[in-house]
Amino acid sequence: MTLSPPLIPVFPAGYGPLPSDFDTWVQASFGFLTAQVVFRAEMRTTQTLNGFTPILYDTILEDPYSGWNASSHVWTAPFSGWYEVTLGHSIATATVITEAVPEISGTTYEMSEVTCTSSTEGGTGASLLASMVGGIDFVQGVAWTSASVSIDVSSEGRVPWLEVSFISQ
C-alpha cells in the first residue's frame, strides 16, 4: 500500500474534528513513518564489471511509489526528505579490489574498498544517508573494480542488492 507523507493538521475555528480526521492525522502518518523501505532491488543475472559500472538490477522486490526506471536503472525519490541508501555485491575473482558505490543524482560517494583474497571472499557493501528532493534526485547502485570481473550471483546471499529507506522529512 502506498502511503502519502504526513500532512500538518489544520484546526479551523469552529470546526469539530471527525473520526476520519484522526485517521489522517494519526494512523496514516504513523503508517507512513514506520513503513520506511521505499525501494528494494536485486540482480539475478551475471554482469561484467570494469572500473565504475552501474549495476543493472533486474528483480524489483519493492517499489510502492513506482520510482524505478528500468531503462536507465535509477530510482527517483517520490518526495523530499532524508533517505538511507544501502547496497552490496560479491565477485568471484581473487586479488581484485572492489567497492560498492552509492550514486545520488550523478554524484558517486566512495566508501571503502575490499580486496578479494579468494573466490569465496568477495563481498562488499555501503550505506549512505542522503537528503533528496522528491521527483528530482535519483539513486543508482554502482560497483567499482580494479580489473574486469563478473558479479557473483551463484547463491542467494551473493546477489547484488540495493535498498532505499525513508528516514524523515
Spell out what each predicted region is:
Residues 5-96, 149-169:
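Terminal (often C-terminal
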Residues 16, 118-125, 162:
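Short, surface-exposed linear segments at secondary-structure transitions and domain or protein termini
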Residues 106, 120-140, 146, 153-155:
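Short, surface-exposed tryptophan/glycine-enriched loops
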